[in-house]
């Protein structure tokens, strides 16, 4: 066998599983179709501006609560710097601007001021949910999915707070709406909570299971919202670093075309270039539709199972506007994340979330500008990219989103310096999320929790994680799913699993904001800082001018060095077909930044890697 385990899909869940398994000594490989890992969590650059491709509102790094990200980095013993936002976000709901404070009583007071007729009920609701959350989530940290929770720890936790657990479990097959009706009567407050569940799990309160909503309504006020210092390049980059430092392989720019079978069991993966890799075990971190509709030959799956997968209802497709505006367009007091609710009565295309993360992280763009990324639903039928209608529809969507942002930020259109749109076609092309449904199957009653794809499949050596599985969408949830998949495989192999231990060393450092370039790499040596800053200048071009083939992966080396993954960068350098310094001068002179007279110092970076001897 080539590997102990192959992970199909390099999003956060797949990277989490792979990094934890590599640390336990398993020979691990990750396959991803993109040149950078991370799936929806990562970056691209336009000029000197860094954009987050998607997931950038990150929960799960707090000191308590559902803090799966923090646990994983502590388990990996991998340092990461994070910025904690002052509040979760601000919701612009009709004429109300509601700040989501990182303090439940303070937020309840704020909400009561917006809905005075429901003030007593609001405080009672948040008191009840907070107590249950404390008993179920905070006092019994458990980083595993419900389908993988063992009987013994479940009973132990239940006996500690039986009433809270009984209440929590009673919400399993009830809607969030039924829970809210125990407390509220005002239709407007139901519309408000509709917006919260549509943001958290892409479902309305009538659709969303109460067991998830009850946690979400509290968790984000307790744990808070975070952003990786220096951009989301660092989150998947640090997980990749852990994989490669422990001997794992990253097979990037290659798509898994099929799961191979021997004697009726998965035995490996065929890549889109025809190469085949063998492994004792597989972990799949992708959509349920691609698994049963594309990767697994119908000969090896049941017709009923394929039909079940096909019936899974997707979340709505999304569009994303990436833009740069004059700094003065964004007024003082604006939050890094602002929800813009155009229609409080219904979920429609006027509902947009604006991410202005350059407010807290000034490394993303120049001093006189801001990055603004706007994400929202689209309900139109999108033509094929090859269609003549596609550019027209794309232009219409750009105009629509710019108009939404202009209402919240007068002068936005005039101050616009750059904009680019990702359509559902774009999203599917880069992430393989079917139809551009960014959150996979909708987490709604009837296909929620245990009625979704489980960690364990009908084959004892194929495990699953990601948005299609039990816990659904969200960065801390998919991270937990990756952790559960890793533990399921470790149990099978008789190896030590990952379990929370009190007193674990903390590897997550919170940094001051606004975060600046001077703060980058401040814990690294001067020599490391110099090459990391050079590497970070790389534009990560989709079609690099410096090295024109995938075998000469200068872009991949620079990306790794920028996050401190020197072992992975040196390994990639040694894998190049020449691996000598003579060719690097030509690469450096062809660097796109050379047009301004300052190409990335590729030779300097490689000399550093050569001198490390790692």
What does each model-identified segment do?
Residues 216-266:
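Helical element adjacent to the flavin cofactor pocket in flavoenzyme catalytic cores
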């Amino acid at each position: 066998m080539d590997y102990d385990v192959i992970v199909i899909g390099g999003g956060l869940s797949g990277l989490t599983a792979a990094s934890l398994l590599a640390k336990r000594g398993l020979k691990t490989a990750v396959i991803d179709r993109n040149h950078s890992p991370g799936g929806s969590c990562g970056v691209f650059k336009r000029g000197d501006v860094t954009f987050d491709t998607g997931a950038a509102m990150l929960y799960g790094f707090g000191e308590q609560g559902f803090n799966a990200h923090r646990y994983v980095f502590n388990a990996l013993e991998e340092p990461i710097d994070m910025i904690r936002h002052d509040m979760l976000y601000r919701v612009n709901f009709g004429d109300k601007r509601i700040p989501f404070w990182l303090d439940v009583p303070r937020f309840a007071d704020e909400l009561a001021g917006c809905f005075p007729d429901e003030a007593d009920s609001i405080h009672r609701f948040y008191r009840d949910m907070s107590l249950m959350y404390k008993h179920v989530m905070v006092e019994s940290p458990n980083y595993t999915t419900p389908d993988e929770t063992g009987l013994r720890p479940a009973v132990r936790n239940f006996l500690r707070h039986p009433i809270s657990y009984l209440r929590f479990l009673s919400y399993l097959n009830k809607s969030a709406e039924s829970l809210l009706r125990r407390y509220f009567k005002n239709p407007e407050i139901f519309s408000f909570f509709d917006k919260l569940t549509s943001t958290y799990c892409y479902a309305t309160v009538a659709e969303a299971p109460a067991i998830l909503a009850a946690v979400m309504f509290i968790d984000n006020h307790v744990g808070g919202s975070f952003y990786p210092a220096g951009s989301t390049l660092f989150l998947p980059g640090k997980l990749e670093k852990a994989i490669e430092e422990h001997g794992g392989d990253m097979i990037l720019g290659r798509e898994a075309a099929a799961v191979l079978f021997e004697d009726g069991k998965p035995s490996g993966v065929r890549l889109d270039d025809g190469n085949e890799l063998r492994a004792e075990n597989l972990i799949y971190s992708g959509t349920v539709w691609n698994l049963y509709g594309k990767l697994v030959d119908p000969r090896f799956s049941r017709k009923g199972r394929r039909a079940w997968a096909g019936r899974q209802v997707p979340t709505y497709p999304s569009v994303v506007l990436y833009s740069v505006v004059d700094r003065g367009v964004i007024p003082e007091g604006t939050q890094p994340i602002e929800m813009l609710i155009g229609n409080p009565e219904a979920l429609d295309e006027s509902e947009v979330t604006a991410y202005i993360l350059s407010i807290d992280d000034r490394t993303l763009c120049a001093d006189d500008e801001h990055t603004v990324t706007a994400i929202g639903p689209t309900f139109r039928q999108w033509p094929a990219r090859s269609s003549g209608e596609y550019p027209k529809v794309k232009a219409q969507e750009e105009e629509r989103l710019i108009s939404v942002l202009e209402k919240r930020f007068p002068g936005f259109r005039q101050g616009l310096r750059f904009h680019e749109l990702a359509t559902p076609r774009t999203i599917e092309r880069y992430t393989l999320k079917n139809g551009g449904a960014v959150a996979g199957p909708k987490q709604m009653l009837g296909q929620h929790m245990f009625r979704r794809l489980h960690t364990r499949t009908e084959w004892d050596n194929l495990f699953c994680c990601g948005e299609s599985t039990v816990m659904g969408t969200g960065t801390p949830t998919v991270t937990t799913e990756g952790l559960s998949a890793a533990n399921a495989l470790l149990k099978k192999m008789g190896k030590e699993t990952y379990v929370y231990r009190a007193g674990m060393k903390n590897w997550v450092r919170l940094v001051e904001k606004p975060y600046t370039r001077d703060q980058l790499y401040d814990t690294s040596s001067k020599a490391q800082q110099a090459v990391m800053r050079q590497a970070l200048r790389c534009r990560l071009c989709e079609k690099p001018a410096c090295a024109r083939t995938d075998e000469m992966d200068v872009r991949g080396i620079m990306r790794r060095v920028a996050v401190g993954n020197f072992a992975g960068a040196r390994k990639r350098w040694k894998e190049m077909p020449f691996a000598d310094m003579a060719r690097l001068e030509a690469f450096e002179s062809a660097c796109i930044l050379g047009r301004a007279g300052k190409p990335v110092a590729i030779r300097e970076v490689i000399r550093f890697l050569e001198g490390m001897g790692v």
